[in-house]
């Protein structure tokens, strides 16, 4: 396997316009082969998607999705650049897929890791640093373990980092980038809210056996 150097990453970025982390991942997946990495990025829609990421996306759809007999509901806003794309079936299918993903992911609270408040990140770090299993480890090792755990936790909260429910080999971010490549426009998941029936309502606890007995007495 070829060594994945900073120069190789830079060259791939210049050829594709993809982000640094995507380029590193592409090179790792393709054992440092530049041409295969370019093709890999194109197949995932990343190469063209990152070039469009700075363009204004002010059109789009607000979409609702109701699941499981009305027990779970989702509202999501996904933006694109033109009304023409927003009204097309490809974009509508993407928005519906994103809404279904949100319905299936009860732990997801933010669109991306970048949206998570810093105070929450700091709190997660404080919790992890205080865990008993890290007590005797050297400071540098402890820091790496803690950072790894925090990164994992933050990704659990991020919609874009979730494996796509219809294809576990894709993340939602990659799914969106594929649509960007196909439609030729910048597409952004802007915001969402998820409703669970009865969430936050304190329910009275009942004894099932007593309920049956009471019903039997008429």
Swiss-Prot record:
<comment type="function">
    <text>Associates with the EF-Tu.GDP complex and induces the exchange of GDP to GTP. It remains bound to the aminoacyl-tRNA.EF-Tu.GTP complex up to the GTP hydrolysis stage on the ribosome.</text>
</comment>
<dbReference type="InterPro" id="IPR036402">
    <property type="entry name" value="EF-Ts_dimer_sf"/>
</dbReference>
<keyword id="KW-0963">Cytoplasm</keyword>
<dbReference type="GO" id="GO:0005737">
    <property type="term" value="C:cytoplasm"/>
</dbReference>
<protein>
    <recommendedName>
        <fullName>Elongation factor Ts</fullName>
    </recommendedName>
</protein>
<dbReference type="Pfam" id="PF00889">
    <property type="entry name" value="EF_TS"/>
</dbReference>
<keyword id="KW-0251">Elongation factor</keyword>
<dbReference type="GO" id="GO:0003746">
    <property type="term" value="F:translation elongation factor activity"/>
</dbReference>
<dbReference type="InterPro" id="IPR009060">
    <property type="entry name" value="UBA-like_sf"/>
</dbReference>
<feature type="region of interest" description="Involved in Mg(2+) ion dislocation from EF-Tu">
    <location>
        <begin position="82"/>
        <end position="85"/>
    </location>
</feature>
<dbReference type="InterPro" id="IPR018101">
    <property type="entry name" value="Transl_elong_Ts_CS"/>
</dbReference>
<dbReference type="InterPro" id="IPR001816">
    <property type="entry name" value="Transl_elong_EFTs/EF1B"/>
</dbReference>
<comment type="similarity">
    <text>Belongs to the EF-Ts family.</text>
</comment>
<dbReference type="InterPro" id="IPR014039">
    <property type="entry name" value="Transl_elong_EFTs/EF1B_dimer"/>
</dbReference>
<keyword id="KW-0648">Protein biosynthesis</keyword>
């Amino acid at each position: 396997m070829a060594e994945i150097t900073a120069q190789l990453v830079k060259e791939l970025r210049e050829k594709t316009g993809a982000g640094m982390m995507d380029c590193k991942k592409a090179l790792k997946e393709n054992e440092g082969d530049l041409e295969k990495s370019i093709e890999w990025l194109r197949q995932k829609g990343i190469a063209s998607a990152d070039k469009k990421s700075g363009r204004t996306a002010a059109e789009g759809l607000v979409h609702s999705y109701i699941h499981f007999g009305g027990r779970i509901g989702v509202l999501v806003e996904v933006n694109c650049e033109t009304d023409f794309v927003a009204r097309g079936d490809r974009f509508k299918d993407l928005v519906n897929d994103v809404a279904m993903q949100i319905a299936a992911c009860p732990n997801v609270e933010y669109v991306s890791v970048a949206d998570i408040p810093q105070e929450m990140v700091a709190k997660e770090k404080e919790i992890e640093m205080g865990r008993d299993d890290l007590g005797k480890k050297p400071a540098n090792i402890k820091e790496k373990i803690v950072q790894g755990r925090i990164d994992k936790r933050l990704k659990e909260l991020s919609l874009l980092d979730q494996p796509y429910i219809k294809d576990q080999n894709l993340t939602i971010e990659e799914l969106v980038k594929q649509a960007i490549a196909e439609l030729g426009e910048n597409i952004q998941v802007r915001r969402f809210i998820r409703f669970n029936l009865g969430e936050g309502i304190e329910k009275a606890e009942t004894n099932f056996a007593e309920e049956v007995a009471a019903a039997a007495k008429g």
